[in-house]
Swiss-Prot record:
Residues spanning the signal sequence: none
The UniProt record lists the keyword Magnesium: yes
InterPro entries (UniProt xref): OPRT, Or_phspho_trans_dom, PRibTrfase_dom, PRTase-like
Residues at which orotate binds: T137
Cofactor requirements of the protein: Mg(2+)
Presence of the UniProt keyword Ribosomal protein in the record: no
Keywords: Glycosyltransferase, Magnesium, Pyrimidine biosynthesis, Transferase
Entry binding sites for 5-phospho-alpha-D-ribose 1-diphosphate: R107, K108, K111, E133, D134, L135, T136, T137, D138, G139, R140, S141
Organism, as annotated: Maridesulfovibrio salexigens (strain ATCC 14822 / DSM 2638 / NCIMB 8403 / VKM B-1763)
MF (Gene Ontology): magnesium ion binding; orotate phosphoribosyltransferase activity
Name recorded for this polypeptide: Orotate phosphoribosyltransferase
Pathway assignment: Pyrimidine metabolism; UMP biosynthesis via de novo pathway; UMP from orotate: step 1/2
Protein's job: Catalyzes the transfer of a ribosyl phosphate group from 5-phosphoribose 1-diphosphate to orotate, leading to the formation of orotidine monophosphate (OMP).
Reactions catalysed according to its record: orotidine 5'-phosphate + diphosphate = orotate + 5-phospho-alpha-D-ribose 1-diphosphate
Gene name of the encoded protein: pyrE
């Protein structure tokens, strides 16, 4: 059902952060940093895939997502919703249901047999497609999905994620250069603010996470990760 209430961004961010912490999707590990496929080293990790197992949480997040999309993009400005393989697919399905729109999903690359399809589902050429994924770090994977959709004839100008790291300075710039505007519900600063307020983690962990958030590039380099933004 299309939402008829539109909470403010601050309320959405705080409640989203609380829910992510409550279901233990948030992990702080400064002593043994996480390594991402992009090459960054990080003391924080978030597992948005876990949300599919919590119906009350995911339903609330989908309501938030639909309200953000309608407010920022428009009520009649999207024709379809496409999920990125694989984590974006369930969220795209729930959002397309909320928005009463057709759904597709896009693979990272063509499957290599049969129709050799990279996109599953149907849309008319020129359709305005919203790309959906669970999260983004530096934004680069969204560009690959958007390019595949555009190659198939879609118009893609917006991408929605539940969670945006919100700390890599070039992420939004990179997306903008690719013709994409990103919408999200919360970022790591929202998580940190709630964690401090509610005392969810010990002070040492919170201090180390804050150091990372203030300077992720140097923190990554000092802990075995990449030290420059990928080209």
């Amino acid at each position: 059902m299309v939402p008829t209430s539109f909470p403010d961004k601050e309320t959405i961010a705080e409640i989203t952060a609380k829910m992510l912490i409550e279901v233990e999707a948030v992990h702080f590990r400064a002593d043994e940093p996480f390594k991402f496929t992009s090459g960054w080293a990080s003391p924080v990790y978030i597992d948005c895939r876990k949300l599919i197992s919590f119906p009350r949480v995911r339903n609330t997040l989908m309501d938030f997502g639909a309200s953000v999309i309608l407010r920022e993009v428009g009520f009649e400005s999207i024709d379809c919703v496409a999920g990125g393989e694989t984590a974006g697919i369930p969220f795209a399905a729930w959002l397309s249901d909320r928005l009463m729109l057709p759904m597709q999903y896009v693979r990272k690359k063509p499957k290599g047999f049969g129709r050799d399809a990279q996109i599953e589902g149907d849309f008319a050429e020129g359709s305005k497609v919203l790309l959906v994924e669970d999260l983004t770090t530096d934004g680069r994977s969204k560009i690959n999905f958007a390019q595949a959709l555009r190659k198939a004839g879609a118009e893609v100008t917006h991408t929605f994620v539940l969670f945006h790291y919100g700390i890599f300075p070039k992420a939004k710039e990179t997306l903008a250069e690719a013709g994409l505007e990103m919408l999200s519900l919360a970022n790591w600063w929202d998580i940190l603010n709630v964690a401090k307020k509610e005392k969810y983690f010990d002070n040492k962990s919170l201090e180390e996470v804050e150091k990372f958030l203030n300077n992720p590039v140097d923190w990554s380099a000092a802990h075995g990760g990449i030290s420059t933004y990928p080209e």
